[in-house]
């Protein structure tokens, strides 16, 4: 498409002004084939890392992960913590819901002996702890579970039934203003888990909204909408969930991508199954009938056995993952078998949410 030279000059000038005023990545072309040069931490899902465009969640930023109950929100954050700890990073978990299961966290690969954990009494206390950890510069990843459980002190000290209109929203708004700059200075990743509520009286459009007001929506560099789309069965027994994650906001790469993966009960994200699928799609792994082969050697009959082979042979698994990351992220390719553009979806112009 040809653009008038004068208009192009004016456009470049205003884009430069916007980036200078609001920071790099505040505006970009939707199809632009680049991502911000930021340090990232893997989500545990290669498809989601690709959908994010930068290879994972960005350091020094605020991330919001929201979805219905039992959709995999906490599991996803624990996978991020496990990946960060493998890189030698220090992580903290602010358990406002008082529901963290250390046994499950350990199964997902989290080093619970070195994971900092706090169960605050009030929302203000939780956010002050976040701020103190951030300003220390010693903590790399902080997870808050969840925004809905950050109860203002006035509400806790009051009686059930008392009206506390807008208290949580004001508390979150003040915290965001305080935290955003400190996170950038200390290069700390702050992840908020959030719950979904329904707006009353919405006749058209999406009635869903998240708790804690609008401040978090604006301050978050990445917002992920996670949903359970189906059940994984072994004969009659349900052993996991089919999961879809939509990147509804992304300030480090183009947004509105999505990824699909499996979460297995007691194991977390089925990363080896994902490697098999992506390997076949990108012709890294050969599939002949039910048999899967890698570099001429058979690795298993059926997807489950091929995945089991990769678990038993971590060196080969790492080699396949490294090659896939170079193919999908190194040359800018952003769409995979499990990540697709959602341009056909409806977009809430006020919040930027896809529904």
Swiss-Prot record:
Belongs to the RecA family. Can catalyze the hydrolysis of ATP in the presence of single-stranded DNA, the ATP-dependent uptake of single-stranded DNA by duplex DNA, and the ATP-dependent hybridization of homologous single-stranded DNAs. It interacts with LexA causing its activation and leading to its autocatalytic cleavage. CDD domains: RecA (cd00983). NCBIfam families: tigrfam_recA. Keywords: ATP-binding, Cytoplasm, DNA damage, DNA recombination, DNA repair, DNA-binding, Nucleotide-binding, SOS response. ATP binds at residues 67-74. It is found in: Cytoplasm. Gene3D superfamilies: P-loop containing nucleotide triphosphate hydrolases. The keyword Nucleotide-binding applies. This is Protein RecA. The gene is recA. GO terms for cellular component: cytosol. One of its GO terms (molecular function) is single-stranded DNA binding. It comes from the Bacteria. The keyword Ligase does not apply. One of its GO terms (biological process) is DNA repair. Disulfide bonds: none annotated.
């Amino acid at each position: 498409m040809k653009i008038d030279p004068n208009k192009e000059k004016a456009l470049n000038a205003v884009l430069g002004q916007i980036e200078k005023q609001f920071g790099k990545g505040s505006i970009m072309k939707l199809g632009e084939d680049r991502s911000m040069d930021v340090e990232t931490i893997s989500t545990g899902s290669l498809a989601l890392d690709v959908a994010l465009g930068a290879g994972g969640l960005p350091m020094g930023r605020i991330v919001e992960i929201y979805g219905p109950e039992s959709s995999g929100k906490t599991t996803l954050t624990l996978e991020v913590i496990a990946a960060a700890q493998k890189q030698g990073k220090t992580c903290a978990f602010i358990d406002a819901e008082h529901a963290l299961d250390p046994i499950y966290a350990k199964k997902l690969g989290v080093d619970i002996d070195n994971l900092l954990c706090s169960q605050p009494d009030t929302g203000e206390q939780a956010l002050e702890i976040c701020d103190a950890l951030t300003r220390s510069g010693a903590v790399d990843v902080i997870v808050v579970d969840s925004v809905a459980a950050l109860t203002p002190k006035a509400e806790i000290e009051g009686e059930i039934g008392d009206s506390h209109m807008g208290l949580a929203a004001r508390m979150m708004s003040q915290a965001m203003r305080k935290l955003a700059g400190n996170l950038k200075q200390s290069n700390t990743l702050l992840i908020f888990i959030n719950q979904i509520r329904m707006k009353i009286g919405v006749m058209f459009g999406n009635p869903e909204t998240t708790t804690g007001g609008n401040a978090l929506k604006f301050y978050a560099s990445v917002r992920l909408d996670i949903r359970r789309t189906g059940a994984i069965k072994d004969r009659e027994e349900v052993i996991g969930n089919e999961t879809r994650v939509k990147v509804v906001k992304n300030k480090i790469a183009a947004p509105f991508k999505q990824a699909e993966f499996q979460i297995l009960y007691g194991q977390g994200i089925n990363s080896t199954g994902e490697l098999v699928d992506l390997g076949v799609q990108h012709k890294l792994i050969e599939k002949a009938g039910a048999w899967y082969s890698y570099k001429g050697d058979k690795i298993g009959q059926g997807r489950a056995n091929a995945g089991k082979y990769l678990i038993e042979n971590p060196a080969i698994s790492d080699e396949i993952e490294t090659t896939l990351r170079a193919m999908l992220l190194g040359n800018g390719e952003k769409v995979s078998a499990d990540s697709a553009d959602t341009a056909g979806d409806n977009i809430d112009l006020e919040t930027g949410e896809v529904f």
